């Protein structure tokens, strides 16, 4: 997802206007690209600690980012979003990109976020698809059915609350954790044919093959699955990504909460 969103993600980070030489925390850093871009934003005297819950993921992020600009200012560590391995009031800001909706105990995580941020610091929650994206232009009914199936599938991982619901309740979650939400920003990512390799790869492999793959097949009718396969399978002559007029629209929301001094 990082490369797919890179132009907009860099813009989002730039518009945060993070203080030069500040210290920040990236909770759920994934492959580490956001951590690199955050490190670039705070300059050569800034520092970013990037957390992932598993050693293998930390090692992968460290390996992927090695030698890239800003990598020497990023420390990758093992850490859980609900039990941060960071002292109280030790960072100037905290970034959590497309991760909070995965944490079942949201309030506990947000209270941990508030614990480690200095008074007056900011907690930035980035969530993709608070509003559903458009990946199948011209097929609104089928795409809605697929989206509903995807929502239902995430109920299990979300302990009875879908990822979509969790994303859409970020504001009340911040309030419940005692944080003042002062800013909410929305960005619309647009991609058109001919697609960049990173865009094509994300849409085909992450969206069509993984998110809309076998995991939701039993939640669609036979007809719906056949239509989905015709439009989404990589070997299909009707794959929408082959259309010279193909486009997708993908919304990103950013919630910025201030920790009161």
Regions found by a protein language model. Give the residues of each.
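Conserved Class I S-adenosyl-L-methionine
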Residues: 168, 182-261
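A short acidic, Gly/Pro-enriched loop at the edge of an enzyme's catalytic core
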Residues: 82-93
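Conserved alpha-helix/loop element of class I SAM-dependent methyltransferases that forms part
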Residues: 3-20, 37
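Conserved catalytic/acceptor-binding region of the Class I
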Residues: 124-197
């Amino acid at each position: 997802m990082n490369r797919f969103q890179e132009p907009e993600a860099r813009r989002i980070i730039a518009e945060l206007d993070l203080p030069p030489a500040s210290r920040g925390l990236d909770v759920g850093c994934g492959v580490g690209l956001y951590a690199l871009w955050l490190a670039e934003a705070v300059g050569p005297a800034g520092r970013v600690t990037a957390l992932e819950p598993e050693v293998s993921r930390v090692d992968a992020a460290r390996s992927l980012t090695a030698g890239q600009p800003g990598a020497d200012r990023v420390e990758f560590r093992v850490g859980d979003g609900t039990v941060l391995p960071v002292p109280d009031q030790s960072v100037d800001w905290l970034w959590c990109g497309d991760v909070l909706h995965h944490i079942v105990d949201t309030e506990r995580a947000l209270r941990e976020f508030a614990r480690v941020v200095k008074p007056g610091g900011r907690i930035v929650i980035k969530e993709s698809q608070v509003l559903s994206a458009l990946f199948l232009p011209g097929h609104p009914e089928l795409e809605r059915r697929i989206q509903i199936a995807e929502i239902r599938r995430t109920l299990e991982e979300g302990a009875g609350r879908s990822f979509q619901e969790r994303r859409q309740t970020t504001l009340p979650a911040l309030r419940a954790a005692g944080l003042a939400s002062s800013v909410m920003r929305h960005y619309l990512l647009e991609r058109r044919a001919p697609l960049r390799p990173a865009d094509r790869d994300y849409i085909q492999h992450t969206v069509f093959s993984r998110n809309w793959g076998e995991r939701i097949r039993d939640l669609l009718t036979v007809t719906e699955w056949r239509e989905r396969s015709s439009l989404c399978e990589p070997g299909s002559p009707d794959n929408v990504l082959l259309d010279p007029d193909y486009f997708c629209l993908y919304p990103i929301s950013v919630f910025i909460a201030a920790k009161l001094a």
